[in-house]
A protein has these predicted regions:
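Electron-transfer interface patches adjacent to heme c in soluble/periplasmic c-type cytochromes
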Residues: 58-89, 109-119, 204-244, 254-268
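Bacterial N-terminal signal peptides
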Residues: 8-17
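The canonical Cys-X-X-Cys-His
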Residues: 30, 36-46, 87, 122, ...
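Electrostatic cytochrome c docking/interface patches
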Residues: 19-35, 152-182
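Membrane-embedded segments
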Residues: 94, 99-103, 107-124
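Bacterial N-terminal signal peptides that target proteins for export
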Residues: 1-9
Length: 283
């Protein structure tokens, strides 16, 4: 009887510890998720010896220039005073701690689909970063695009909050690929054409066109991938070199260096399987 009580007590203690560890988040998983989400590219200034995640990267768009903010845990310049709930609100609902909406240059229309566990682990990882006191640079937007209240109207038309729900009737690998593409990888933010309001064109998901900075981006539906073998495409997403020896434009080159080359072979295979499953759309 005593032995059974001891075993039960140990099990209870272990279960409590495991639950607490889960609640705190897995920083190792979070680091992988940060790579899958491309956080480094948007939140690190484009210059030699820039401090990672300290902000300053410029995104030039037809609406003006947006600057990625400091997301290190510095108490004044970064996210040091944020609670996990503030982070979840930003990612899931596109709102600042004070309730104001973020401009959708921050791809929360995609990040809203990240599930609760991944948000927790990603937050845990961001808390481990070295704090930087680099002040976040204000956006430089043309009239009237700097009026933040207009984002609320934009959201009514183009934003649906909520985590990704696995689609029935398709394989686990395709669902995993859909999650990587639609949520973490936010591929549609660049590869889906947009209307004059900056909203994604309905029915044209991943069909290519002009990216956020006005440059041509390719069609990722089977129409655009028909000349690629899976093995060649996977090699390209790791090495940044096509089977013909070509290299991509700098923007995609950075995505490959910081994101796709860091994915596991299983996740790369899932990503490709999902893209292959999409309906082919014309360029």
């Amino acid at each position: 009887m005593t032995q059974n009580i001891r075993l039960a007590a140990c099990a209870l203690l272990f279960g409590t510890w495991a639950a607490a560890a889960s609640a705190q988040g897995d920083t190792k998983r979070g680091e992988y998720l940060a790579k899958a989400g491309g956080c480094l590219g948007c939140h690190t200034e484009d210059k030699k010896d820039a401090t990672p995640f300290a902000g300053g990267r410029a995104l030039k768009t037809p609406f003006g220039t947006f600057f990625g903010p400091n997301i290190t845990p510095h108490p004044q310049a970064g996210l040091g005073k944020w609670a996990e709930a503030d982070f979840v609100r930003a990612m899931r609902h596109g709102r600042r701690p004070d309730g104001a909406s973020y401009f959708p240059a921050f791809p929360y229309p995609s990040f809203t689909k990240i599930d609760d566990r991944d948000l927790r682990d990603l937050w845990a990882y961001l808390r481990t970063l070295a704090p930087s006191n680099r002040a976040s640079q204000p956006h430089d937007l043309g009239f009237p695009f700097g009026w933040r209240f207009l984002v609320t109207v934009w959201k009514w038309f183009f934003f649906t909050p909520g985590p990704y729900v696995p689609a029935p009737g398709i394989s686990d690998i395709v669902n995993r690929g859909a999650y990587l593409v639609q949520a973490l990888g936010h591929c549609g933010e660049c590869h889906t054409p947009r209307n004059f309001l900056g909203g994604p064109k309905r029915g044209r998901f991943l069909a290519g066109g002009k990216g956020p900075e006005g440059k041509d981006v390719p069609n990722l539906t089977p129409t655009g991938l028909k000349k690629w073998r899976d093995s060649d495409f996977q090699d390209f997403l790791v090495s940044g070199i096509t089977a013909d020896g070509d290299v991509p434009a700098e923007a995609m080159g950075e995505v490959i260096r910081n994101t796709t080359s860091q994915l596991t072979p299983q996740d790369l295979a899932a990503l490709i399987a999902y893209l292959r499953s999409l309906p082919p759309l014309p360029d």
